[in-house]
């Protein structure tokens, strides 16, 4: 048996950045951070939440600072933390108000700014065109406005995060580069150039998006551009506005897990709607599940190069009628499951209504069964609704045997199963077979000893990393819990922008700017709209500071505009404003009807 040359990743080397009493960077452990949801002016409540976050394992905490009232509150919060011997670094989140950053840096350990709104106006889609002269003048204006903060941070030894958000790029950047990954990267680099020119290097970067595919591509591109310039600054990873529940965990794990597996990332946050405390165990599990990969890190040329399907092999679907040319989901059924399960219960677990024969949108395309069970009554019943494959009809490739990957017997099969044990071996497999057009079914099994969240994170990180690069033709999941298998399978396919079979929800985690009960409203909107067809994306955002920008690719948006009032958006355009919150959900339904996407629940 041949020993494979596994495509290892090493952790990207970075400068150490000091934030309060801790250091961030490649020579230090990956840090977990979160953000308070209390009003920053509620000093008692904010301090209590910060203390709770630290107890749960949070390393860095951020608070929103909208103006001078919040600046003064931060002074009291920091004093209270010092009095209670709480050393967790305090970070101020700044949007639209540079003076708040200048003042608050005196009492916090780090400031976070958004290049899309710190100096320039956020893009309002006016169609304004910047000449080269106007663009150069804007860069000079940026230098003049941003340099006082850089100078003060440098003088006081305070850190800064330059946090770019997809969808909230400035008008100037959007006009030149579009709302693109390139625009995100150059937005960050413009601010980086000011820091470098002023010899200030306590800087961390983030490139967030609610779309994991955009987020991963943006971080890879920024890491490449920074290292081309020998600017080895740390990265903070996050999928912004990931949402709630299992879907939010999947999105975060697909994006963050992919980058961690490539050696990128020095701090992480899972932005889940609800209490920030709920984010911490997910982050802990995510780091735990990527530990095996980190133990494999060794030398490699450029592990975070911008991957593409052209580099690693093309994706060929099985194209089996009535499947068609889609990326399919298969569920493995063992002989034990087929022999012991109640037929009706098994069909229901697969998403088949045994009374009406109706198929759920998250029903897999097919099942894989042992050949000996093919003629059993239960398999015959399944075959009335789904495709059935004999497991023995295609080779199951050993991830540890490279010779088998390229053997004549393997390459002559109509398709193959490849068991994915780790991301780097799978990438090695596709790299060696990059000229092959043979469909590959990615096969995944889960350790039954994992908790539910650990299982979700493990599968999302392993499968998501490959799907984001367009690898494989279909997925075969082999879990005891069949219903969880199909739910996770489609959520991961949706997070990787491969397929969309259900409504996707974008919702922010909440912060001190949030104007309504975000979790409750999100859940109500989900319940009212979850029956709508796949491909639809609805955003629920707590305020207008980040809301309109961070829901960049949502079809419809529900955004808090002021206390008790909601604005409704179609794409990036506000179409109904200042709706009383008690009427807003019904108005959203009416808006969906006006645009022809509403249908009544059955």
Curated annotation (Swiss-Prot):
GO terms for molecular function: 4 iron, 4 sulfur cluster binding; 4-hydroxy-3-methylbut-2-en-1-yl diphosphate synthase activity (ferredoxin); 4-hydroxy-3-methylbut-2-enyl-diphosphate synthase activity (flavodoxin); iron ion binding. Its cofactor is [4Fe-4S] cluster. Its EC number is 1.17.7.3. [4Fe-4S] cluster binds at residues 508, 511, 543, 550. Binds 1 [4Fe-4S] cluster. GO terms for biological process: isopentenyl diphosphate biosynthetic process, methylerythritol 4-phosphate pathway; terpenoid biosynthetic process. InterPro entries: Dihydropteroate_synth-like_sf, IspG_atypical, IspG_bac-typ, NO2/SO3_Rdtase_4Fe4S_sf. The keyword Iron applies. It catalyses: (2E)-4-hydroxy-3-methylbut-2-enyl diphosphate + oxidized [flavodoxin] + H2O + 2 H(+) = 2-C-methyl-D-erythritol 2,4-cyclic diphosphate + reduced [flavodoxin]. Pathway: Isoprenoid biosynthesis; isopentenyl diphosphate biosynthesis via DXP pathway; isopentenyl diphosphate from 1-deoxy-D-xylulose 5-phosphate: step 5/6. It comes from the Bacteria. Keywords: 4Fe-4S, Iron, Iron-sulfur, Isoprene biosynthesis, Metal-binding, Oxidoreductase. The keyword 4Fe-4S applies. Belongs to the IspG family. Converts 2C-methyl-D-erythritol 2,4-cyclodiphosphate (ME-2,4cPP) into 1-hydroxy-2-methyl-2-(E)-butenyl 4-diphosphate. This is 4-hydroxy-3-methylbut-2-en-1-yl diphosphate synthase (flavodoxin). It comes from Chlamydia trachomatis serovar L2b (strain UCH-1/proctitis).
